[in-house]
A protein has these predicted regions:
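Extracellular or lumenal secretory-pathway regions
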Residues: 1-65, 72-174
Length: 174
């Protein structure tokens, strides 16, 4: 993985900060057949954290006899730093620190569309997300590890913070 820092926030990281292999999203290892890597962790600079791709199945698609299908898993690296296949998927990830150091934490969240895969029935009222419409997938050629086709489907949500102004009798505000 390459080192990362941004001019917009104080967030920065180096490859030595991680307890596992993390790829930069430009190159991937050969995967083998059957796949010898069930998990690929990819650092995503837009979110200032790695995202996980997990092996789902082997398919015949797009003119190829055999492709390995991997699906996106949102793993909270702070809760599961080893980033392996035993890590539970988070419902949402707080990415506020990647966007700005000036807005409160827990303001901007990353999730799957319509909270696909979310485990709370309270927030899934009338949502009927399905794999074909809402899952992020990437298909790899197994021998070279070359990505053939990918579709990234994510949702950004924000918490609305209300900062009430006080109106003074003279019309000024605090």
């Amino acid at each position: 993985m390459i080192d990362f820092e941004t001019e917009y926030t104080p967030f920065k990281t180096t490859s030595h900060d991680w307890r596992t292999d993390i790829f930069d999203g430009l190159t991937f290892p050969p995967l083998g057949n059957p796949p010898n890597r069930k998990v690929l962790n990819v650092f995503q600079p837009d979110f200032c954290r790695p995202v996980q791709l997990r092996y789902n199945r082997t398919v015949s698609k797009f003119g190829f006899d055999m492709l390995h299908e991997y699906v996106l898993k949102l793993i909270d690296v702070e809760q599961c730093p080893q980033m392996d296949e035993t890590c539970p998927e988070a419902d949402k990830l707080d990415i506020t620190k990647c966007l700005s150091a000036e807005i409160p934490t827990e303001t901007v969240f990353l999730s799957k569309p319509h909270m696909y895969g979310h485990n709370s029935s309270l927030t899934n009222i009338n949502f009927q997300p399905d794999f074909n419409k809402h899952e992020s997938t990437i298909y790899f050629e197994p021998i070279s590890g070359t990505p053939v086709r990918a579709q990234l489907r994510i949702q950004l949500s924000t918490n609305a913070w209300i900062d009430r102004l006080r109106l003074n009798p003279d019309g000024s505000t605090e």
